[in-house]
Design a protein with these regions (language model features):
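Glycine-rich phosphate-binding active-site loops on the catalytic face of alpha/beta enzymes
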Residues: 19-21, 43, 72-77, 96-110, ...
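Short beta-strand/loop segments at the ligand-binding rim of alpha/beta enzyme cores
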Residues: 11-16, 64-78, 124-137, 179-190
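Glycine-enriched alpha-helix->loop->beta-strand junction motifs that scaffold or abut catalytic
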Residues: 45, 64-68, 96-100, 126-129, ...
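Active-site-adjacent beta->alpha loops and helix N-cap segments on the catalytic face
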Residues: 2-3, 28-29, 50-69, 80-88, ...
Length: 191
């Protein structure tokens, strides 16, 4: 699918997240089982799946044929963010066939000394046709990511950073403001 086809397919629809990491009940070391969750989500009508590992990207794409928003959760020393924090994870997601790459676009410390703006520019230089989803926690980060050229903004980190942790539920105001002030899809996630 083209970038336009993917963005049109998800517009106004619910995207289902099918992910489990080590230590969670649905994580199985020997084999991904997230493709089964994705199968059910497809039957329920989701236009895309969000998932958090290379093996799940591959298994879900094979099972469903749906566009996949892929990410890798990994904590490196010196990095406050853990969602697709380095080019290694971006490379792995692209190689696995991820249709959209989600990455932490908060303005927190990056262990390699680059800014999130520099990281986005590096990704876009290496993969000019990539669809990027910025996982952000507040308005400033969303606007910054949009200005850097990401294709989708998600409120994924709202309520999960030191400076937004007082949120008890979804930040509907953040979603509304970003939808009004940007010209890209805004996906509501987070607490």
């Amino acid at each position: 699918m083209t970038k336009k086809e993917i963005l049109d397919a998800i517009h106004g629809k619910m995207i289902i997240s099918c992910q489990a990491v080590e230590g969670e009940p649905l994580y199985v070391e020997e084999k991904s089982i997230m493709y089964l969750m994705a199968r059910a989500a497809k039957q329920a009508g989701t236009p895309a799946i969000r998932t958090s590992s290379i093996r799940d990207v591959i298994a879900i794409k094979e099972e469903t044929g749906l566009p996949v928003i892929g990410l890798v959760k990994i904590q490196y020393p010196g990095y406050e963010g853990y969602i697709t924090p380095t080019m290694k994870e971006v490379d792995d997601l692209v190689a696995a066939g991820s249709d959209v790459v989600a990455l932490d676009c908060t303005l927190r410390k990056r262990g390699d000394g680059t800014t999130v703006n520099e990281f986005i520019a590096q990704i876009k230089e290496k993969y000019p046709d990539i669809i990027l989803m910025a996982d952000i926690s507040n308005y400033e980060e969303g606007i910054n990511a949009w200005k850097c050229g990401v294709d989708i903004v998600g409120t994924t980190m709202s309520g999960y950073t030191d400076y937004t942790s007082k949120k008890d539920g979804p930040d509907y105001e953040l979603m509304e403001r970003l939808a009004k002030d940007t010209d890209i899809p805004v996906i509501g996630e987070g607490k």
